[in-house]
Amino acid sequence: MKKYFLFLTTTLIGAVAFISFSFNDKQQPQPQQKFIIEHENDIAKQEAGTHNGGGNTIGYSFFSKAKDLKLVFRKRVLKPGSAIGYHLQNEDEIYYIISGKGIMKMNDSTFAVQAGDAILTRPGSSHGLQQTGKEDLVIIINYEAK
C-alpha cells in the first residue's frame, strides 16, 4: 500500500508540475519560423484581370499569410485577351516577364514586352499591361507591402 501511495503521490506531483509549466504565462516566445515554402498549385486563384483589366488570369500571392513580411511577391498568368488595367502606382513595383508577350502602357509611352524584360514602375507613374499573341503572358510582380 505504501508503494502504491508513493507512486500515486509522485505521479500527482509530476502532473501538477507539468501543467503549471505548460500554462505558465511567462513562457519564452517561440522563435519565428526560419523559412516558408509554398507551391503555386496550392495558392492559385482564377481572377479577372486586376485593376479592371478584364479577361481571365490566374493569380499566385506567395507568402500572403507570412507575418511581418515587408515584400509582396506574386505571379500572374494573363490568358489570351486579358490585361492588368491602367492604374496609378504609389510605390516602386517591378514586373518581370517570365514568358509570353504583351504591350505595356507606361505614362505617355507604349512598348512591347517579352520574356526576360524587367520593368520598374516608380511612385507617381501609371501603367497597364495587355497580353498579346496566343501564348499566356506570365509575370512576376514584386513591391513593398503597405
Give each language-model segment a name:
Residues 1-29:
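Bacterial Sec-dependent N-terminal signal peptides
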Residues 19-70:
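A short, N-terminal "cap"/entry segment at the start of jelly-roll beta-barrel domains
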Residues 67, 123-146:
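Ligand-binding loop in jelly-roll beta-barrel domains
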Residues 72-89, 123:
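Conserved short histidine dyad/triad with adjacent acidic residue
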Residues 83-84, 103, 119, 123-129:
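Histidine-centered metal-chelating micro-motifs
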Residues 90-93, 97-102:
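Glycine- and acidic-residue-biased ligand/ion/polar-headgroup-sensing regions
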Residues 109-123:
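Short acidic-glycine-tyrosine-enriched beta hairpin
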